């Protein structure tokens, strides 16, 4: 089979409901060395694909183009965060935020985005898994005060005021006042 045009690839990724067709076009895109994340985003949002199929494509893409891996993992996380039809999807979102942070540990976005997907009513992803993730991040990001502030919020949700207060103090020591210049709320 000959090469596909970028328009053909986009069209298939966004509209096809046939897994075999999508897979064939995906394989062709890899052979053609298409390393622009944009058409693959369409693939990740294809409603006909199961979470396992989306993961298959995303993992293969990240392995094939290591320069795209960080963006691929962030996109996979956001897809699973938004498609919260099952509790597992929240945990998949956290899983991919963790993979993104492993590639670029100095980036704060995976940590903050993971916190944003937390649902306190359902405790998904598990609160303590988020806490552990952020605690690892404070040693790698250039502005740990940002993560300490989020940790303080998470500890508040867990009812642990001592650790919450400690994190607020660490945030103040590390970075001064929060974004916007306002003092922290007591």
Question: Which residues are covered by each model-predicted region?
Answer:
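Helix-turn-helix repeat elements of alpha-solenoid scaffolds
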Residues: 13-20, 45-57, 86-92, 122-128
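N-terminal leader/linker segments that initiate helical-solenoid repeat arrays
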Residues: 1-25, 29
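Charged low-complexity stretches with an acidic bias
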Residues: 60-96, 167
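Structural signature of alpha-solenoid helical repeat scaffolds
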Residues: 64-65, 85, 102, 122, ...
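Acidic, Ser/Thr-rich low-complexity linear motifs
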Residues: 150, 180-186
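Inward-facing hydrophobic residues that define packing positions of alpha-helical scaffold repeats
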Residues: 23-27, 58, 90, 97, ...
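TPR/TPR-like (Sel1-like) alpha-helical repeat modules
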Residues: 94-102, 129-143, 152-179
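Amphipathic alpha-helical repeat scaffolds of TPR domains
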Residues: 3-7, 27-46, 66-82, 105-120, ...
């Amino acid at each position: 089979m000959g090469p596909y045009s970028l328009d053909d690839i986009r069209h298939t990724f966004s509209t096809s409901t046939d897994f075999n067709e999508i897979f064939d076009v995906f394989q062709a895109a890899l052979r053609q060395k298409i390393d622009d994340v944009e058409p693959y985003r369409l693939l990740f949002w294809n409603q006909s694909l199961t979470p396992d199929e989306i993961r298959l494509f995303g993992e293969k893409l990240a392995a094939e183009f290591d320069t795209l891996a960080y963006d691929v993992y962030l996109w996979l996380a956001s897809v699973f965060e938004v498609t919260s039809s099952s509790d597992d999807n929240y945990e998949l979102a956290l899983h991919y935020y963790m993979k993104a942070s492993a590639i670029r540990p100095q980036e704060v976005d995976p940590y903050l985005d993971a916190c944003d997907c937390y649902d306190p009513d359902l405790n998904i992803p598990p609160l303590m898994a988020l806490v552990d993730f952020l605690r690892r991040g404070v040693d790698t990001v250039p502005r740990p005060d940002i993560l300490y502030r989020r940790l303080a919020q998470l500890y508040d949700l867990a009812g642990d005021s001592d650790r919450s207060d400690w994190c607020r103090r660490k945030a103040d020591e590390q970075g001064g006042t929060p974004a916007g210049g306002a003092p922290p709320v007591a």
